[in-house]
Regions:
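Generic protein-terminus/edge-of-domain signal
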Residues: 1-46
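Short acidic-glycine-tyrosine-enriched beta hairpin
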Residues: 53-68
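Short, Lys/Arg-enriched, Trp-marked, Pro/Gly-tolerant hinge/linker segments that flank
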Residues: 119-182, 195-207
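Ligand-binding loop in jelly-roll beta-barrel domains
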Residues: 69-99
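Terminal helix-turn-helix DNA-binding modules in bacterial transcription factors
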Residues: 172, 176, 184, 195-235, ...
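A secondary-structure capping/hinge motif
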Residues: 193-200, 240-252
Length: 262
């Protein structure tokens, strides 16, 4: 699917540009790159940010930082309202040169929204002051550690299977079903997962499930509904979640959920 054009990045007086976008569930922005850094802020809904070697879940009220010239794609998991800001190479030097999923606090949220809303209205000096403060807040924001490894893009068959699992990580879809869809044997796919990702299919899918569940909990969704969507009973899901992350789903939601703020 064609990607939307970024805003005009040629005005040197404005080293940060902002734009608001919305996408339906299932939408995909194909892989691309640009010379400016980018922050994608999920106001509501969830997206997956895919780079050449990993996928990062971006739940509501979270943002992802992309350094300049990093090839990336976006897959929308649920109806998405987002705010994007583009940072010039000069401003981007104040931030890390790797992708980061950030917890968006009240001040950073207001800065991102203001930078988008006032993109064409504020005078350059005022806008630059907002941009400098936003960079400081981005550097101070708390980070998320949830990441899912992806195979090399040259392995198109395995990458397509991984993307299918990310779209529906339920236990109901096993390696046998994936092998049948791919026209390969279970043994062949097992070897591909181990060789390309350093782990077996079950372990990799569990990482996807944890990322998906964590995003849903941050969004305030009920534990039973999340468990059912992933193919678990509520008790089995809670046991798996606690075993992997050290806290129960309810405890995780209480710590991380942020009420929706448009």
């Amino acid at each position: 699917m064609a990607r939307p054009a970024p805003p005009d990045l040629s005005d040197s007086r404005r080293p940060l540009r902002g734009v608001a976008r919305s996408y339906p569930a299932g939408h995909r922005v194909d892989a691309h790159e640009h010379a400016w850094g980018q922050v994608l802020y999920a106001v509501s809904g969830m997206m997956w940010l895919e780079t050449p070697d990993e996928a990062l879940p971006v739940p509501p009220q979270r943002a992802v930082w992309l350094p300049p010239s990093l090839r990336h794609a976006v897959r929308v998991a649920s109806e998405l309202q987002m705010r994007n800001i583009y940072l010039s190479p000069e401003l981007s030097r104040g931030l890390e040169d790797r992708t980061l999923v950030l917890v968006v606090g009240p001040l950073l949220r207001e800065l991102i929204v203001s930078l988008v809303e006032q993109e064409r209205q504020s005078d350059p000096d005022y806008y630059r002051a907002l941009a400098d403060l936003a960079v400081l807040e981005l550097g101070r924001a708390r980070r998320s550690s949830l990441r899912v490894p992806l195979p090399d893009a040259s392995d198109r068959r395995l990458l397509a299977l991984c993307q299918a699992v990310m779209a529906n990580p339920s236990l109901d879809i096993g390696l046998e079903r994936l092998a049948e869809d791919a026209g390969a044997s279970v043994r062949t796919l097992s070897r591909l997962f181990q060789r390309s990702l350093g782990m077996g299919f079950a372990d990799w899918r569990r990482q996807v499930q944890l990322a998906t569940a964590s995003a849903a909990l941050i969004d305030g969704r009920p534990v039973a509904g999340i468990a059912h969507a992933l193919g678990y009973t509520p008790s089995a899901f809670s046991d798996m979640f606690r075993r992997e992350l050290g806290v129960s789903p309810t405890e995780y939601r209480a710590e991380h959920h942020q009420p929706f703020q448009p």
